[in-house]
Regions:
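Short loop segments at secondary-structure junctions
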Residues: 10-13, 70-71, 95-97
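Hydrophobic ligand-binding cavity/cleft-lining segments
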Residues: 1-44, 148-151
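Generic structural detector for well-ordered beta-strands
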Residues: 6-10, 37, 51, 66, ...
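Well-ordered beta-strand positions in beta-sheet-rich domains
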Residues: 4-6, 60-64, 87-89
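Short amphipathic alpha-helical segments
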Residues: 12-18, 126, 130, 134
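Glycine-rich portal/gate segments that line the openings of hydrophobic small-molecule binding cavities
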Residues: 27, 37-83, 100, 132-151
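A generic structural signal for ordered secondary structure
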Residues: 20, 50, 88-90
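Beta-strand/loop substructures that line and gate deep hydrophobic ligand-binding cavities in soluble
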Residues: 78-132, 149-150
Length: 151
């Protein structure tokens, strides 16, 4: 499964990046996120339990977050459940209209015969939808609060 979501946000690149890496902020600015719980925490690596909803359906997963400040990227690796092994890459590219934020999800389903069905349910219904909503809400937040967000 390969899913890509992107959006252009009209604020400085590091403002968007710092907002994206600040997982504690997510439940306050992303209404579909119920909570983020840290299991391990350090400046460049965290292990978290993330919980969101999709059309009222609660879901949660455990991820390792790697913050790469040199490359200005955020990587996640799902550690448990149906999405175990999924790799997620957030990139931030300056473009004339602002910053192009892209989220790429890559997952090889463990049960190959179920992959087409899992792609529709896990990939399209959950992941693609939640990532789009995350980007839209993050855009609204950072564009409305540019002077309040620390880069």
């Amino acid at each position: 499964m390969h899913k890509t979501n992107s959006i252009t946000i009209c604020v400085p690149k590091m403002t968007v990046f710092e907002t994206a890496v600040n997982l504690e902020l997510w439940p306050r600015i992303l209404p579909h996120y119920r909570y983020i719980r840290y299991l391990e925490r350090s400046p460049g690596r965290n292990v978290v339990v993330m919980a969101a909803t999709r059309s009222g359906i609660p879901i949660s997963w455990t991820s390792e977050q790697i913050i790469d400040r040199d490359r200005v990227e955020v990587r996640f690796r799902h550690l448990k459940a149906f999405t175990k092994g999924m790799r997620v890459l957030w990139t931030f590219q300056e473009v004339p209209a602002g910053v192009q934020v892209e989220i790429k999800h890559d997952l090889a389903f463990r049960v190959k015969i179920l992959a087409p069905i899992a792609d529709k349910i896990i990939g399209d219904f959950f992941i693609h939808h939640i990532a789009n909503k995350t980007l839209r809400c993050m855009k609204s937040y950072v564009e409305a609060n540019t002077n309040k967000v620390t880069a």
